[in-house]
Amino acid sequence: MLQFLLSLLRLPACLRCFGARRRLVPGTFTRRCLVAAVSCCLAGPATSQSPPAESRFQTFLAPSDTLHKGRLRLLAGGGAAAYTATSIGLYHIWYKDYPLGKFHFFDDYGEWENMDKAGHFLTAYAESYLAYKGARWTGIRERPAAWIGAGVGTLLQATIEVMDGFSEGWGFSTADLAFNTAGVGLFLGQELLWQDQRIMVKVSHTRPNYGAAPLTSSTGVTRTVEEAATILYGKFPASFIKDYNGMTAWASVNPASFFPKKKKPFFPRWLNIAGGYGAQNVYGAYGNAITDQEGNVFSLQQYPRYRQYYLSLDADLRRIPTRSRALRTLFTALSWVKLPAPTMEWNSLGEQKFYWLYW
């Protein structure tokens, strides 16, 4: 009985806690909030019982205030395993069909309408940022964690460049190295200057519908455009990395983060403005021709290559208010993905297009 009376004294505070939500979301959600408030009060004061599994999970996801050696070992071991698995995966996706040779350099700037350079830039940025968040989770202080993130991003991309250097199909590219460094530098510069990522580098990808138009080689072999594109770019998941016709690279800016924290902007703090770059009808490094495994060459010169420039809205999921550590972790993990939104396109053919939703 005494516990019940004490709970009633807590009822106004609980209702005030849910009252703000009542003004925002009417109807069923409001009723559920009120029921939850009453249930919270009737549950009585906290006891010394062990926290529920969900609470322990939330605590596990929260960054540690001090260096947590167990987390550090877990992150280091998991990172080493992921590094090994990724290196093996990249070898099978990119390099296994080409012989290895002596280490050599190769100037590939301008190939693939520079979509591969955009890929290097955004990948180096994303790797650095996610490694930084992992370091912070273990309790490493902010500035050292930023340098660790930059080091991890540099190491991962350097692995690819070294593989390129020994592959007869490619070579070590100083242009790739420059874009890798720029991606890492964008992350590190923002972290050291603002302790925040106000400009996020993101990607979106939708594989085009290549269609069934016939292509005939000089030897009389016929394939469809879809089949030729699959020869060049592969199928999912390899095509997500390799198909430059479906990829768009974005710089997503959060305007609210440039306002003083005490000054509330007139738009949501999670709303971003994004500029994007893409290309279409890219069927080769410089020219549009695809060679299959039998040596048949299919020309696609009838499909002119062009570059695309985009302006779109976006959302910085990390800035959406939530008390759920699980959601915060998920939002951080997805922070490199551009969300579908209304988009304007300008391209090198002189066209302008509008999309209600573009991804």
Named regions from a protein language model:
Residues 243-249, 269, 303-311:
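Residues that define the transmembrane beta-barrel architecture of outer-membrane proteins
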Residues 205-209, 277-283, 317-319:
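Transmembrane beta-strands of outer-membrane beta-barrel pores
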Residues 133-139, 188-193, 253-264, 317-323:
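Outer-membrane beta-barrel proteins
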Residues 152, 156, 199-201, 269-275, ...:
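Transmembrane beta-strands of outer-membrane beta-barrel proteins
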Residues 185-189, 249-255, 311-317, 354-356:
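Residues on the lipid-exposed face of transmembrane beta-strands in outer-membrane beta-barrel proteins
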Residues 34-117, 121-128, 132-137, 224-225, ...:
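N-terminal targeting leaders of membrane proteins
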Residues 82-86, 145-165, 181-184:
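Small-polar-interrupted transmembrane alpha-helices in polytopic inner-membrane proteins
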Residues 120-127, 164-191, 310:
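Alpha-helical transmembrane segments that form the membrane-embedded catalytic/substrate-binding core
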